[in-house]
Each structure stands twice: as C-alpha cells, then as structure tokens.
Amino acid sequence: MLLTTSRKPSQRTRSFSQRLSRIMGWRYINRGKMSLRDVLIEARGPVAVVSERHGNPARITFLDERGGERGYILFNPSFEMKKPELADKAVRVSSCPPGSEGLCNLMGLEVDESSSRDAWSIRTDEEYAWVMELMDARGTPAGFKLLIRDFRVGE
C-alpha cells in the first residue's frame, strides 16, 4: 500500500501520514503537485490518501489500483510527539470486534488474538464508534490512536 496526502497538506497532516506509514510498513510519498493518476501509476497497487479538515488529518480514503474507492475512514488522530517503540511493523490486530471487520480489511490488518505487541487494539467507545490504539513492543499503549467516527467499505 502506498500512503500519500491530499494536496497542500498542513505540517500536522504530513507528520501524521509519515508516522502512520512507518507504523504500518506502507510506502509514503510526498504528493506535491502530483495528480491522483500519477500517484496511482507510482503506486502500482492500492493507495491510501489522507485528507484534512481545519488543518488536521481527518479522513483516509482507500483506492484500488485503478483509482476506484474501496472505502474510507473518518477519524480524529491522537498521537504523542515521541515515536512509538516498535520491534516490527504493526500489521496485526489483537481483536476485530463485530462490526469492525471492514475496518480491519481496509487497513490490511491480520487478526491475531495472541498478539499484544506491535499490534492494534480495536474497541468501542462512548464518544466514538471505534478506537484503534497501537500497542508497542512491550505490549503497552504506544501513544498513537485513531478515534474513528465512521467508516465505509465499498462493494
């Protein structure tokens, strides 16, 4: 998966995108004035585009290799300035609660209930539909969360 931003992103959106790409093991490119078509050619596969609202990252749109929308996630980010201490890329999720399977599929996460390190934890919340929290190499919260308001998965 290739991760990029919408055009003219804020520093906070660029920083979030770079950090998410490192955590997930995705390739990241600075979009600049590149068209979405050029991004798809560069990617040669699926693409995730981070968009912003009021200068903050707020949406990740997932595109297939032809540019068709696979789905999107609306979220509020929550991350500390320190980088998470991970031994490996976080491509596993310790649990995928009922109703969040599409979210796991969009992000390309493998469900492994035995993993508690370098993995995501997904849970429900009173204020948000879902909270995706990254667990570090020690199995403790790494200071990186996606507070998910909504997500949609295409057919």
Swiss-Prot record:
Coiled coil start-end: none
Gene Ontology annotations of biological process type: rRNA processing
A single GO molecular function term of this UniProt record: rRNA binding
Superkingdom, natural source: Archaea
SMART domains: Brix
Keyword flag Cell division: no
Residues annotated as domain Brix: 1-155
SUPFAM superfamilies: Class II aaRS ABD-related
Swiss-Prot/TrEMBL keywords: Ribosome biogenesis
InterPro entries: Brix, Brix_dom_Rbsml_bgen_prot
Job of this protein: Probably involved in the biogenesis of the ribosome.
Name this protein carries in UniProt: Probable Brix domain-containing ribosomal biogenesis protein
Gene source species: Methanothermobacter thermautotrophicus (strain ATCC 29096 / DSM 1053 / JCM 10044 / NBRC 100330 / Delta H) (Methanobacterium thermoautotrophicum)
Lineage: Archaea, Methanobacteriati, Methanobacteriota, Methanomada group, Methanobacteria
